[in-house]
């Protein structure tokens, strides 16, 4: 819900409740972190919530706003440590798009202002959530985004209701549609059940 906090309490609560309802339907106890601002991300009691967590999930909203809230904060530093120790990270929409060096400001009105700094945890990579419907929102968006992928970088487009699940190096596609990978100018598309060998370069590994 952090990525939607700037939209107001109704939006934040809506995303939070969706998450609680989803995990509740699976019989999994879940808690919404009180993480709306950079001040929250500096509070020891928020980072302490990671202790004993079995997973962390960031939902949708504006990925640039999410990055602004957490990048360079004690919360994110603690989360990186937890991920290295084995804590699973899951994200949909903004929750995955925020992870890279640059991300999308989804409040922007045109392509010229769409790019913003991301968290920079996943390097040399760009994610494209909602890949199969992005052009219905902004005509020409898929061509623009794919054309913005840096030389030597990897682009990963994730269709609606589709996920890639793995250990950071090997992945399996789950869902109704596909994952689209652009590497060295070549597209490869993967459907449900197919495996992707794609190690994601992480900032903490490069340090």
Where are these regions (language model features)?
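Class I SAM-dependent methyltransferase SAM-binding "motif I" and its flanking Rossmann-like core
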Residues: 59, 65-136
């Amino acid at each position: 819900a952090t990525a939607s906090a700037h939209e107001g309490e109704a939006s934040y609560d809506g995303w939070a409740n969706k998450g609680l309802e989803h995990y509740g339907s699976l019989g999994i106890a879940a808690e919404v972190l009180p993480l709306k601002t950079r001040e929250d991300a500096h509070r020891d009691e928020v980072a302490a919530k990671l202790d004993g967590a079995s997973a962390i999930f960031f939902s949708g909203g504006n990925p640039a706003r999410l990055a602004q809230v957490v990048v360079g904060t004690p919360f994110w530093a603690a989360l990186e440590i937890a991920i290295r120790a084995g804590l699973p990270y899951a994200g949909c929409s903004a929750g995955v798009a925020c992870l890279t060096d640059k991300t999308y400001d989804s409040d922007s009105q045109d392509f010229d202002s769409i790019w913003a700094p991301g968290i920079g945890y996943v390097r040399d990579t760009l994610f494209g959530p909602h890949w199969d419907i992005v052009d219905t929102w902004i005509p020409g968006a898929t061509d623009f985004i794919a054309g913005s992928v840096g030389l030597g970088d990897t682009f990963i487009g994730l269709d609606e209701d589709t996920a890639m699940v793995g250990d950071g190096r090997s992945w399996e596609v789950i869902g109704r549609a596909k994952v689209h990978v652009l590497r060295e100018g070549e597209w490869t598309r993967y459907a449900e059940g197919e495996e992707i060998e794609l190690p994601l370069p992480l900032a903490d590994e490069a340090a």
